[in-house]
Regions:
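Generic structural signal for bulky hydrophobic/aromatic residues embedded
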Residues: 18, 47-48, 144, 174, ...
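Active-site regions of oxyanion-processing enzymes, predominantly non-cytosolic
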Residues: 124-141, 167-188
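Cysteine endopeptidase catalytic domains of the caspase/legumain-like
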Residues: 38, 152-153, 157-164, 168, ...
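Active-site His/acidic residue clusters
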Residues: 63-69, 145-158, 177-180, 184-213
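Generic structural signal for well-ordered alpha-helical scaffold segments
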Residues: 82, 169-173, 214
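Short, structured patches in soluble enzyme cores that scaffold and shape functional sites
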Residues: 97-98, 143-145
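Intrinsically disordered, low-complexity coil segments
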Residues: 45-51, 146-148, 160
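N-terminal catalytic scaffold of extracellular/periplasmic and nuclease hydrolases
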Residues: 1-104, 108-137, 207-210
Length: 214
């Protein structure tokens, strides 16, 4: 993108693939929008045998996490992005709910698509906590969701409610192997807090991201 203010889709595409594209486009050539760009996560998975995990505190099909597994002409193709998630074969996904989980209502929802592709679809915190190494491909949708079907801000989370750090710990537990793993972790709620000019929420989520990295 040549925009002075690019969006999450084009900037995440640049991070994930090394290619520029237009705002709103996820991992596609900006001129024709019909040539996909391979992501670093896809390369590590296919060429090096790495296990791959994707985590976001916002919707798991939001532009930034999607830029590591999806290829779409527009970031608004939420259902199709969810289908690509299931088809990626990546071993671990965790975060907020799909934005258009039911698509147009004529086919299986994104949870069903993932299950059909061999994923354990976990929607409770207890279920997530019970997962152990060897569980297989796993999709965790946070049990406690806020507006926009994203995870709660760290400052709003109830006592004992899983936050980003917990999903990172679980991801490391499930992905650890002799060949290595790649775990993309986004604290998308920092972005949402800044859009809302909510300094307190932003600070708490920055601290939560710091805890997750440590």
């Amino acid at each position: 993108s040549t925009s002075f203010c690019p969006d999450s889709a084009s900037t995440a595409t640049a991070i994930a693939t090394g290619h520029k594209t237009e705002s709103g486009v996820i991992n596609m050539c900006p001129w024709t929008r019909d040539v996909p760009y391979e992501t670093i996560a896809e390369k590590l998975h296919a060429q090096k045998g790495y296990k791959v995990g994707i985590i976001s505190s916002v919707n798991i099909d939001h532009a930034t996490p999607a830029a590591f597994y999806a290829h779409q002409k527009t970031r608004k193709n939420y259902y199709q992005i969810g289908v690509e998630l299931a088809n990626s074969g990546f071993e671990y996904f965790a975060g907020g709910e799909f934005q258009k989980v039911n698509g147009d209502g004529t086919g299986p929802n994104n949870h069903e698509v993932a299950a059909q592709a061999g994923y354990n679809v976990v929607t409770t915190q207890a279920g997530a906590a019970a997962l152990t190494a060897g569980a297989g491909k796993t999709l965790i949708i946070a049990e406690n969701l806020a507006d926009g079907k994203a995870m709660n801000y760290a400052m709003d989370a109830a006592a004992g409610e899983w936050q980003l750090t917990d999903y990172v710990k679980k991801g490391i537990e499930l992905l650890d192997n002799s060949k290595g793993f790649f775990l993309m972790t986004e604290s998308g709620k920092i972005d949402w807090a800044c859009h809302a000019n909510d300094a307190a929420a932003s600070i708490h989520d920055v601290l939560e991201m710091s805890n997750a990295v440590q």
